[in-house]
């Protein structure tokens, strides 16, 4: 059951990331690309969680989980918020940080093998420098950017910023309860992804009347109706 919940959370985050990517391709708004990358990292972290619970954790699944969930998700959220506020220098900074994070996740040695089905704790497998320190700094600065920009513009975009702040709070709670197991963590991941997605759309002035899944169903129904009429 825990693996199914984690897998479902991964699929949801992946679907929402894909929708944001499609919107970026249509509008070329840079914050949409950064937010899409953040939700994609969130989806990969949830997929690694499902892998670890279903098949047992190993070094590879832990590295993916730590890279995507511990090193990338929050910093990329911050990059998106900075881009939304017009700070274009955030884009190259985001690329530079992503490269650093990937290098750390691939290269740093583990202090102990990763085994079992419970969510591994970083302090049991990674030295403080550089992996854990970079994660702390990246998450702190990324979250700070999101919160400061959301609060400073909340009068202009109350709904969007409120949803983003709620999503950040839910994501932080999910990280805090990781010790309780994969099921509650997966639920928090799914809830945070949905809140963040809605907040991103409201903040960027996108239409949010239909969910991505409902839009797809509507397009399929229209194509089917068109085919029947032609016949």
Per-range role (PLM):
Residues 15-21, 76-83, 133-157:
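Alpha-helical transmembrane segments in multipass membrane proteins, preferentially the mid-helix core
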Residues 27-31, 154-157:
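Short helix-adjacent coil turns
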């Amino acid at each position: 059951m825990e693996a199914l919940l984690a897998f479902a959370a991964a699929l949801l985050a992946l679907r929402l990331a894909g929708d944001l990517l499609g919107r970026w391709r249509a509008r070329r708004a840079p914050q949409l690309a950064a937010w899409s990358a953040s939700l994609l990292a969130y989806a990969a972290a949830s997929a690694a969680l499902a892998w670890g619970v279903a098949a047992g954790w190993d070094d590879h699944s832990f590295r993916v989980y730590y890279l995507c969930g511990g090193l990338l998700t929050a910093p990329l959220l911050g990059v998106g918020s900075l881009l939304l506020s017009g700070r274009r220098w955030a884009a190259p900074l985001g690329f530079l940080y992503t490269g650093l994070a990937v290098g750390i996740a691939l290269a740093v040695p583990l202090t102990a093998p990763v085994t079992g089905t419970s969510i591994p704790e970083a302090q049991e497998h990674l030295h403080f420098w550089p992996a854990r320190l970079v994660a702390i700094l990246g998450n702190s600065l990324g979250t700070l950017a999101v919160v400061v920009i959301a609060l400073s513009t909340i009068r202009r975009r109350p709904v969007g910023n409120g949803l983003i702040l709620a999503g950040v709070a839910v994501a932080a709670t999910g990280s805090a309860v990781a010790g309780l197991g994969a099921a509650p963590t997966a639920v928090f991941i799914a809830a945070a992804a949905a809140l963040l997605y809605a907040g991103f759309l409201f903040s960027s002035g996108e239409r949010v009347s239909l969910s991505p899944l409902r839009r797809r169903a509507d397009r399929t129904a229209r194509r089917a109706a068109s085919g029947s009429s032609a016949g």
